[in-house]
Amino acid sequence: MAQSPAHLLGQIIGELLEEAIIELYRPIAMELSLYLDYKHPRPTRNGNKVVSWTDINGNSHDLDIVMEYNGSEIMRGQPKAFIEVAWRRYTKHSKNKAQEISGAILPIVKGYGQNCPFYGAVLAGEFTTTALAQLKSEGFSVVQIGR
């Protein structure tokens, strides 16, 4: 399926943003003695790049960043933080993205409640106040870059 140059550019911007955020979180994870998981080949996933966790309903969700206690390249740890990263050029689909983030993260957090995981979103670009308010009302810590 053909993709427009604008769509491809948006994907590149999103991937660059995610890589930059991962580098910002790396020293935090080290300081807290947490394993930082992100999209990369990991032996405990049989070399699969995708960070995927299962929610309380048995649904699998691909995630951006997970910090794990007692995790390593060869062993999955206990989740201590779930962080999603998103970029939007226009506000048109920002509410949908907020709903997608909360729909993935909240059922996972419920399943790992005993670990008291942090959950947040790093959002760049244009997001409506209602999209931001929804995430905040659901307990997300939100960092907004730009606007």
Language-model segments: residues:
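Catalytic micro-motifs at enzyme active sites that drive phosphoryl/nucleotidyl and oxygen chemistry
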Residues: 51-56, 69-73, 108-110, 121-132
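Interdomain/boundary linker segments immediately adjacent to catalytic/signaling cores
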Residues: 1-42
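"Short basic amphipathic alpha-helical interaction patches in structured regions
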Residues: 80, 96-102, 134-138
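Active-site metal-binding core of divalent-cation-utilizing nuclease and nuclease-like domains
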Residues: 37-76
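Domain-level recognition of nuclease-like catalytic cores that cleave nucleotide substrates
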Residues: 117-147
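Active-site-adjacent loop/helix micro-motif of nuclease/hydrolase catalytic cores
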Residues: 75-77, 89-100, 130
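Short, basic/hydrophobic alpha-helical segments
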Residues: 102-113
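Conserved catalytic cores of phosphodiester-cleaving nucleases, focusing on short active-site segments
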Residues: 65-67, 80-89, 101
